[in-house]
Design a protein with these regions (language model features):
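Alpha-helical transmembrane segments and membrane-interface helix-loop junctions
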Residues: 1-195
Length: 195
């Protein structure tokens, strides 16, 4: 049982490290949102493009026109948001910081709660993460081979990159479920010192 606890803690440390690093995606996401809102509100992209055209800096105009569009900014916002969510989901689960509906669960003792957690992991989380991981890989691979781009004319290319976060996030959530499962098994079947 001690090995299960060691494995659980190792997985939790890995997920904590990934979650803490991924949480930094919040800063570029906020920056992109702020820039997008300000440029759309005040029409700064149009002003910038007009300035470069008026001063005959066509190279700079082409860069702004090609790389910085409102559509690309909006798509980058949701790409960063999806990556942040998927990379931190496992971290949230091992830290028990996700939302729970405590209507029924709060009335039970610790052992019953632990059994509910084990049953929930085995019946719901493991099959769910497996299916989304498996189909997410196919989804990503198909996108990569088709060289899928945004449906918007001026949107982001390489759509497979964001789609790859789905199987990655599900793998991390599976690891989190495994860590919580091991921890609960040690609690239920191990000695008092181990739990």
């Amino acid at each position: 049982m001690q090995q299960l606890l060691i494995a659980s803690r190792a997985i939790e440390q890995l997920l904590s490290s990934i979650g803490r690093i991924a949480a930094w995606l919040l800063l570029p996401m906020m920056l992109v949102i702020i820039v997008d809102v300000i440029t759309r509100k005040f029409g700064l992209l149009t002003i910038t493009k007009d300035f470069f055209l008026a001063t005959e800096m066509h190279g700079a105009h082409n860069i702004v026109n090609k790389y910085i569009t409102s559509t690309k900014m909006q798509e980058l916002e949701w790409h960063l948001h999806a990556a942040l969510f998927l990379l931190c989901m496992g971290f949230g689960y091992v830290k028990n910081s996700h939302v729970r509906i405590e209507i029924v669960r709060e009335k039970f003792d610790v052992y019953t709660k632990s059994w509910l957690e084990v049953i929930g992991i085995v019946i719901f989380i493991i099959p769910y993460t497996y299916l989304l991981f498996r189909y997410g890989l196919n989804f990503t691979e198909r996108s990569f081979h088709l060289n899928e781009v945004s449906a918007a004319l001026t949107g982001l290319s390489h759509r497979w990159i964001i789609k790859a976060f789905l199987p990655l996030g599900m793998a991390l959530l599976f690891l989190a479920a495994l860590a919580v499962l091991l921890r609960n098994l040690v609690f239920l079947f191990g000695s008092k010192e181990e739990s």
